[in-house]
């Protein structure tokens, strides 16, 4: 079977991509490759200084690279709306939205909007951002939305009765739930896009096991075991960032990819941890149509962002569908807007 690599990516000149969390790791590699193939790339990052340094790094490696930055804190709906406004102002058309940013297994914390931090960052922020820039995607024939999930979704379950973990918090469960939410969102979004006959498709990906900044919350032993210096013994279980970004890049740029597909490393050494990108299987829970619809409704209520999906590629300039409607946000808790659990 042919191995899919970055050499299979066509010229992306004239296409604009937004990559969240693009200042390091998988996001930076994804942005670098897209820019190297001619795309104009917007690095949407929480820390604008780090985003600018990442942009400088990409330009230093390729003087032709067209890279800009925008501040995006996915844990803040106000920041998401500001970033979406900036993106919409700068990008009349948007070919790719890569929902890459994420956090993993953090101590319990509530955001300023009252949401559990992992769920807010990994799912709700991306749900809101996607809806708020959707008109720019719908205005672009062949546009794609790629959301990163994780093998962690396999152990994930949606606790709709306590999405904010008020009744008890376990970092691994919060992470698994958020990664399952990424897939439920992707499948429901693509279903709605298809039903509307829209020119945009939604896909998902996972990187396998890659040593990135996400692992900074893990134990020293775990960090050591997956580090590059242990490559001689962990080669079967851990891959580098360049390989880890390939499933996302394939979902974003392979002409043969279809909406609703999920890409990850091809099975190697009987695991799904490493390998070249191919279609991947997601859990039975991720295909639960009732949970997909329920999560969508809950996400609209919590974020205040209601999607408007209309049919008809391409939309004439100036006649794009209106952006997602923003309503008053319903917070997940009463009392203090932001709190930590002791």
Regions found by a protein language model. Give the residues of each.
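Rossmann-fold NAD(P)H-dependent dehydrogenase/reductase core
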Residues: 1-222, 301-316
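Pocket-edge positions in alpha/beta enzyme catalytic cores
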Residues: 43, 72, 236, 284-287
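Short glycine/proline- and charge-enriched loop/turn segments
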Residues: 161-169, 222-229, 274-282
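C-terminal helical subdomain
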Residues: 178, 230-280, 287-293, 297
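Short, solvent-exposed turn/loop segments enriched in Gly/Ser/Thr/Pro and often Arg
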Residues: 265-267, 314-318
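Short, intrinsically disordered C-terminal tails of secreted or membrane-associated proteins
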Residues: 336-341
